[in-house]
Regions:
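Glycine-rich hexapeptide-repeat left-handed beta-helix
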Residues: 128, 137-140, 145-205
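Hydrophobic, well-ordered beta-alpha structural blocks that scaffold small-molecule cofactor pockets
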Residues: 1-40, 46-49, 53-54
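Short amphipathic alpha-helical segments
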Residues: 17-20, 74-78, 120-121, 191-192
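Redox-cofactor binding/interface segments in oxidoreductases and associated redox assembly factors
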Residues: 62-65, 108, 197
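Conserved acidic residues
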Residues: 28, 60, 104, 158
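Short loop/helix-cap segments at secondary-structure boundaries that form the rim of catalytic
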Residues: 34-43, 99, 188-191
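Hydrophobic, well-structured mid-protein blocks that either form specific transmembrane helices
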Residues: 76-132
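Phosphate-bearing ligand-interacting subdomains
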Residues: 37-95
Length: 205
């Protein structure tokens, strides 16, 4: 029986759990740092991060299902330092090119498209119905929200969040820790640590 540990028992965690089942995991074991939760729908929560770290050998794989990019990366680094068997999960209805690179800890959701020679970093969220075109470079801990379209040869820095329904023009460079607001159209480069919103997207101070 294939068993996976999922750290993070929120709404995002539920989606990750279903993808894990579709990928062949028969047993889902949740962990969460909230003291107020004992279950995630029908799945029992078996403890917090420390409990997961102390029981890693019991699992065939583990993944972090936390929406906050910074926290997700903190947790993935902790698990890596403890030799966790971190996996990626790809929904069966996603279209992922055999020429793309998907690094560990990343989740690719239903109807997402990853085209040839795109590289997706560690512990990214590529959400429902989003498109990453050819030759894109997506850094570690990035969240690409539902219905986002990233054109070819775009570079997105680590821990950046691209809001739902946004579009990014080809050859654009988006920095580290950037927030792009929902429905935005990015036609110019965005520097590190910026927030950009609108059509076209403009940097907000």
């Amino acid at each position: 029986m294939l068993t996976i540990a999922i750290l993070g028992a929120s709404g995002h965690g539920k989606v990750v759990a279903e993808i894990a089942e579709l990928c062949g995991y028969q047993k889902i074991v949740f962990f969460d740092d909230s003291k107020d939760k004992s279950k995630c729908e029908s799945w029992k929560i078996n403890g917090d991060t420390d409990k997961l770290v102390s029981t890693l050998e019991a699992f065939d794989a583990c993944i972090v299902a936390i929406g906050d990019n910074k926290i997700r990366m903190e947790k993935i680094r902790l698990l890596q330092s403890n030799n966790a068997k971190i996996t990626s999960l790809i929904h069966p209805l996603a279209s992922v090119s055999k020429y793309s690179v998907i690094q560990k800890g990343t989740v690719i959701m239903a109807n997402a498209v990853i085209n040839p020679f795109a590289t997706i970093g560690i512990s990214c969220i590529i959400n429902t119905n989003s498109t990453i075109e050819h030759d894109c470079l997506i850094g570690n801990g990035v969240h690409i929200s539902p219905n986002v379209a990233i054109a070819g040869e775009v570079s997105i820095g680590s821990e950046t969040w691209i809001g739902i329904g946004s579009s990014v023009k080809q050859n654009i460079k988006i920095g580290i820790n950037v927030m792009v607001g929902l429905g935005s159209v990015v036609i110019n480069d965005i520097p590190d640590n910026a927030k950009a919103f609108g059509v076209p997207a403009k940097i907000k101070l």
